[in-house]
Amino acid sequence: MAEYFTAADAELTRRIGIVNLHDDFPAAILKQRFDGVYDSLRAYWLPRFRAGGVGVVVAAVFTPSIYFPDAALRHAVWSLDALLAEIDDNRNDIELARSVADVERINRQGKVAVLLALEGAEPLGQDLSALRLLHRLGLRMLSLTWARRTLFGVGDWEHDDRGGLTAIGRRAVAEMNRLGVVVDVSHASDETARDILEASAKPVIASHANARALRNHPRNLTDEVIRAIASSGGVVGAVAVANFISEE
């Protein structure tokens, strides 16, 4: 990792601590295991987390549309099973966190804390029983949409983004508030994001998004939504995707 980080960079990240609010590495781990490689967390990801000073990483489980609708939950289970198996195999260096107290303890022990997230609510199906079950497994963050329209709301890539949060989406927000699962609006349409912020009694976040005022892109947030997230007690995680930063 020397080509990316200097010694000064490493010392700075060690002192301030880095929280990676969104990382898609569970998909890479699942693919590697399908290919017969069972140690990619240790061999590839952990060295990068260490080099970058990452103390907390949100592991985002994403289900491709080819698994919709019937196999969406099955794919999410595959991803979670693969991820948790590799975390368990590397328990001296990385550990699943279920609470703030867990994160603090894990970091004090010099380990990386992992929080589980679901990117897109398709694995939940048409009711909230899977949400409750996934919470028991450690789910602590959830995006109700990923780009497209779901049963729960409208994504940010829909050409017709009218409709916002649906009735089951509102029930999901209420249940997430009750369980302690954070709502992530990163891939929600403007209307859906506003509806979530109005419906949620708990802090709302955008785990990976930038300011639309600086780069006019549907994945970025309006000033109105950014201010509402801040007012809720939530945060916005900046994302270093070139097209979300500049047209150049």
Tell me the role of every PLM-derived stretch:
Residues 1-161, 216-248:
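N-terminal hydrophobic targeting/anchoring segments and the immediately downstream early-domain regions
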